A protein has these predicted regions:
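Conserved alpha/beta-domain cores
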Residues: 1-353
Length: 353
């Protein structure tokens, strides 16, 4: 996309209305579709940043059967056996399985049961396979397709693609779901942890919320940059669009209907950050607690509190890569935010040179 021209499809939301056009442009180089979860959530959140009525729920509830995710997946599967003008077909590969089968016996069993159930659902919907974040998941999910006895689902009939206003509305459809303090803590904890992992040189990392450190019944999930971005993005929505809580919270005193306000965010940020600083080296590298972790916290705080949503979270990570100086990080973040707002310019170059 560095040399993109007008008309280029920039994101997943737009791509769902141009599935056949993408295939036509790539021609014989096109193999199939993949329904990524985080990427589509990010795409919708960015596209709907202007709409104050669009507020996501807890991220745990935005599954592939939730509202806009369900409709996104359905459009992709409809394109699977729709031939292009040259008679070529394409296959659909299900979303990424982030589970890692490492933990307590009970924790692994429960997580693997969910993973297999998810794979069975995708297979029944028309997926010809899925990809996994860890090689140990291959023998766990592969039998789902092996049991069917078919190499793929080419030839299976699906309803044809349509392009109606109802189709378009479905791609951003929200449905009632929880928005809670527990959900906010999970978003914040993992969001900061990913920023810290990136600063340590890891593009992908096994993470879970700090409140579950030491609990081997709760498994780590393999996460990448989309994780950090969407988690902070949802918190930004809650704060700046008037997201209201759906459950009481005894610890903070928050009640059903309370708005997710800046003071509440700052309190949760301080508490979750403190948990990470006190965590064992197994969960948060000790050598990061005075170097990259404070920088990750600063990025998260700036991203969520700023009135204007920052479109490129990755830029804030990149301009601070190899930087362990919090004061310098604050200068770079402010420089970036000023350039973005005043000049509509990104800073993508290495600021160390």
């Amino acid at each position: 996309v560095l040399d993109a021209v007008p008309g280029w499809t920039w994101d997943q939301l737009e791509a769902t209305f141009q599935l056949m056009e993408i295939r036509a442009a790539l021609g014989p180089h096109f193999v199939g579709y993949n329904t990524g979860r985080w990427d589509y959530i990010n795409s919708v959140a960015d596209a709907m940043a202007w709409d104050r009525s669009f507020i996501n729920p807890n991220i745990e509830d935005i599954t592939m059967t939730y509202g806009y995710m369900r409709n996104y997946e359905d459009r992709v599967r409809r394109a699977v056996n729709t031939a292009d003008t040259d008679g070529r077909f394409a296959l659909w590969q299900g979303g990424m399985e982030p589970n890692i089968p490492v933990g307590s016996e009970a924790g692994v069993a429960a997580s693997m049961e969910r993973a297999v159930a998810g794979a069975r659902r995708e297979q029944s919907e028309g997926a010809s396979g899925k990809w996994v974040a860890h090689w140990k998941m291959v023998p766990i999910v592969r039998p789902v397709w092996a049991e069917v006895g078919e190499a793929n689902q080419l030839g299976r009939s699906f309803p044809p693609l349509t392009y109606t206003e109802e189709d378009a509305a479905g791609l951003t459809l929200l449905e009632p779901a929880p928005r809670t303090i527990r959900g906010a803590r999970n978003l914040l904890s993992v969001g900061i942890q990913y920023g810290n992992a990136f600063g340590q040189g890891f593009q992908a990392a096994a993470l879970k919320p700090a409140d579950f450190f030491g609990d081997d019944d709760i498994l780590y999930l393999m996460e990448d940059v989309a994780t950090g971005e969407i988690r902070l993005s949802i918190l930004w929505e809650w704060l700046h669009k008037g997201g209201s809580l759906t459950e009481d919270d005894a610890e903070t005193g928050a009640r059903v209907g309370d708005l997710f306000a800046a003071a509440l965010f700052r309190r949760l940020l301080a508490e979750e950050y403190d948990k990470l600083r006190r965590a064992s080296d197994r969960d948060v590298h000790d050598d990061s607690k005075g170097t990259t972790l404070p920088v990750a916290r600063e990025i998260a705080e700036t991203y969520v509190l700023d009135q204007v949503k920052t479109p490129w979270y990755i830029d804030l990570l990149n301009i601070n890569l190899n930087n362990h100086d919090l004061a310098l990080a604050k200068e770079r973040i402010q420089l970036y935010m000023t350039a973005l707002k005043d000049e509509s310019q990104r800073i993508t170059e290495n600021l160390d040179f």
